[in-house]
Amino acid sequence: MYDKSVIEQLIWLRLCQVLVNERYKLGEFKIPIHLALGHESVAVAVHRCIKNNDSLVLTHRNIHYNLLRMGSLKEEVNEYYLRESGVANGRLGSMNLANPLKNVLYSSSILGNNLPVATGCALGNKLTNLDGVVFVVTGDGAIEEGAFWESLLFAKSNSLNLIIIVENNRWSLGTRIEERRADILLDKLAASLDIGYYKLSSNDPFEYIT
């Protein structure tokens, strides 16, 4: 039996982004905002899997995760307006928006920067005997960076509770991956380090949750 609330969250998340986009097109925001249309399913699944001691480390494209964790469009939009009534009192805007009270520890607008931060958070959990899992979201561009490979190796070497989610739309700005570089076989990379790897290729959040 499907949980109706999962579907409701998917629809709500899409509508929130559409509303933000309409205001963005009118030039109401003075900061760049990266929408996540089409990325809703994974975000809903992660949101519903997170426990109290778990945490999220995000990229510049964090609107979907922050909306779900906050459960409110108003405070996030106020943050985009850089108002004091925003999630972070108008100080973080969009690309660096974090909300530690809702398990969002850090967001970074620098390519690959959040990976070593997340790895450090996972190490901190281990050293302080916290059983939480750190979920870090990255993209297909960041997996080309040394920070990605080093974070994988460090996390495995130290048995850290770290889950890396790679959102891959096979585009880097205006160029397809096939035009720009050789393919990176993440399944083989994970196997070489004896790391669990799962490829999720549908928009079915129930598949991700289970």
Located regions from the model:
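Positively charged, low-complexity intrinsically disordered leader regions
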Residues: M1-I11
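Cofactor-binding active-site loop characterized by glycine-rich and histidine/acidic residues
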Residues: V18-E22, E28-N158, R176-A182, D187-D194
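A short, structure-level motif marking secondary-structure boundaries and short turns
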Residues: S5, F135-V137, R170-S172
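Conserved structured core elements
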Residues: R14, E145-G146, F206-I209
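Conserved N-terminal diphosphate/IPP-binding helix and adjacent helical/loop segment
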Residues: Q9, L13-V20
